UniProtKB/Swiss-Prot annotation:
Function: Reversibly catalyzes the transfer of the carbamoyl group from carbamoyl phosphate (CP) to the N(epsilon) atom of ornithine (ORN) to produce L-citrulline.
Any single Gene Ontology cellular-component annotation: cytoplasm
Protein name, UniProt field: Ornithine carbamoyltransferase
Catalytic activity: carbamoyl phosphate + L-ornithine = L-citrulline + phosphate + H(+)
EC class of the enzyme, as a word: transferase
Protein EC: 2.1.3.3
Top-level taxon of origin: Bacteria
Pathway entry: Amino-acid biosynthesis; L-arginine biosynthesis; L-arginine from L-ornithine and carbamoyl phosphate: step 1/3
Database matches in Pfam families: OTCace, OTCace_N
Source organism of the structure: Wolinella succinogenes (strain ATCC 29543 / DSM 1740 / CCUG 13145 / JCM 31913 / LMG 7466 / NCTC 11488 / FDC 602W) (Vibrio succinogenes)
Subcellular location: Cytoplasm
Amino acid sequence: MRHFLTLKDFSAQEILEILALSKEIKDDLKKGIRPPLMQGKVLGMIFEKSSTRTRVSFESGIYQLGGMGMFLSNRDIQLGRGEPMKDTARVISRMVDMVMIRTSGHERIEEFAKYSQVPVVNGLTDSYHPVQLMADYLTMMEQGKDQNPIVAYVGDGNNMTHSWLMLASKLGFELRVATPRGYEPNLKIFEEAQKIASLSGAKITLTNDPKRAVEGADVVTTDTWASMGQEEEKEKRARDFQGYCVDSALMGLAKSDAIFLHCLPAYRGQEVSEEVLEGPQSLIFDEAENRLHVQKGIMVWLDRKRS
C-alpha cells in the first residue's frame, strides 16, 4: 500500500506514470466519458485547514470516478476536541477506502498514515503541497514546457517551494528559487533536494535576486507572501518582499513564450500584478482545473496499488 504525502517518496517514473494516467482521465472527461474507476469507494476528507480548490476538486473528483466524498472538519470529528491522530486514523481508515488530509504540521499526516489501513493523500501541509505540483507539471506538459525547462519560483520559501524542490530534483530540470533573506526554504529539505538532484542531473539554485532567477526562464511561478496562519506577519512580509512582485517588467526577463503559474488564491498587486495575472502568459485557471484531473489520477493509482 502506498500513500501520497510528498514527491520525495516517488520515483521519476512513478510521477510520470501518475501524470500520464491523469491526462488520460482528463481526455476521457472532455469527451464525456467517465469510467467508474473507483465505483462505490469512499474518500474521507479531513480538513483542519479550509480550502476552495482542494475541497471542490477532491469531492468532484471522487464523484466523477463513481465513488463518494465525506467532508470532515474539526467541528465534525473528535480531532477538533483533542483525540490523538493515531486513534482517529485507526477508526476512520476502517470505514473508508482512502483519506485526504489538509492540515498544518506535516508530522500530523505522517502519523495518520502510519496508523491508517488505507492510502492517505496530502491535500496540503505547512511543509509540502504535492498535489498542486502535479497539477502545475501537467499544465507545463500540456504547453510543451516539460522538455528540460527552466522554472523560476519567486517569493516565500514555503510548502510550494519545498514541493518544487522535490519535483525538480526527481525529474531532473532546472529550478531557480528567489526569496528575500530570511525567507529561504527549509535547509534540511533543500539539502535533501540537492542530494536527489545530484543523481537526476537537476540544477537547483537559491538566490535573493528575483531578476537573476527569472532571466531566460520557461516558467515563472509564485505564491502568496503570507500563507494561512501567518496573517499577523502580513504587514512585515509586505515590506520584506518589496521587489518580489511578478509584474510585467520581471516577467519580461523570462523567455518570450514563458508561462506564469500560481496555485491561488492570488493577491493582486502583492506577489503578482493584475496585468500578469490576467495576461496571455497566465495559465492559472487551466492550472486550477488540473487539480481535479491529477487528484483523480493519484486516487486511482493509489487504489490500484492497494488492490
